[in-house]
């Protein structure tokens, strides 16, 4: 099966446009060029958006890694503190623990009172 306008069946004087009328062929080419340019601009926009998303993901991953290390160090610090408090509560130093709690309550009360007066 042969397509019209290809090979030997092309009408005389229509070389290069495959048998289409010049106006119809040019209109199709212009529409194709316009659609191609539109598609190119959309692909460029999507590409730049995906690159920006990639940069944002890298930054967020870096922040998450920093937060993870900070949480790990805080967890270790709190674990050591709780261990010391357990040792303190087990020993015969219950008076010292009671004094420390009373002093802490006093300090918080003073801070609360100072903030409230402002």
From Swiss-Prot:
Residues carrying Phosphoserine: 50
Residue ranges annotated as Vesicular topological domain: 116-118
Keywords: Coiled coil, Endoplasmic reticulum, ER-Golgi transport, Golgi apparatus, Membrane, Phosphoprotein, Protein transport, Transmembrane, Transmembrane helix, Transport
Residue ranges of domain t-SNARE coiled-coil homology in the record: 26-88
Taxonomic superkingdom: Eukaryota
InterPro entries: BET1_SNARE, T_SNARE_dom
Residues spanning the membrane: 95-115
Gene Ontology, cellular component aspect: cis-Golgi network; cytosol; endoplasmic reticulum; endoplasmic reticulum membrane; Golgi membrane
Keyword Endoplasmic reticulum among record annotations: yes
Cell compartments where the protein resides: Endoplasmic reticulum membrane; Golgi apparatus, cis-Golgi network membrane; Golgi apparatus membrane
Mode of membrane association: Single-pass type IV membrane protein
Topology feature Cytoplasmic, residues: 1-94
GO biological process: endoplasmic reticulum to Golgi vesicle-mediated transport; protein transport; vesicle-mediated transport
Function: Required for vesicular transport from the ER to the Golgi complex. Functions as a SNARE involved in the docking process of ER-derived vesicles with the cis-Golgi membrane.
Quaternary structure and partners: Interacts with SNARE complex members GOSR2, SEC22B and STX5. Interacts with LMAN1/ERGIC53. Interacts with STX17.
Similarity-based family: Belongs to the BET1 family.
Annotated protein name in UniProt: BET1 homolog
The species this protein was found in: Mus musculus
Taxonomic lineage from the root: Eukaryota, Metazoa, Chordata, Craniata, Vertebrata
């Amino acid at each position: 099966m042969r397509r019209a306008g290809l090979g030997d069946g092309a009408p005389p004087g229509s070389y290069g446009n495959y048998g289409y009328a010049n106006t119809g062929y040019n209109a199709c080419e212009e529409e194709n060029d316009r659609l191609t340019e539109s598609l190119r601009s959309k692909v460029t926009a999507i590409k730049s958006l995906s690159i920006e998303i990639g940069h944002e993901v890298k930054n967020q991953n870096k922040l998450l890694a920093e937060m993870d290390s900070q949480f790990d160090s805080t967890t270790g610090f709190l674990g050591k503190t709780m261990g010391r408090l357990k040792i303190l509560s087990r020993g015969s130093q219950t008076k010292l623990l009671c004094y420390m709690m009373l002093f802490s309550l006093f300090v918080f009360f003073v801070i609360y009172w100072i903030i409230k007066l402002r």
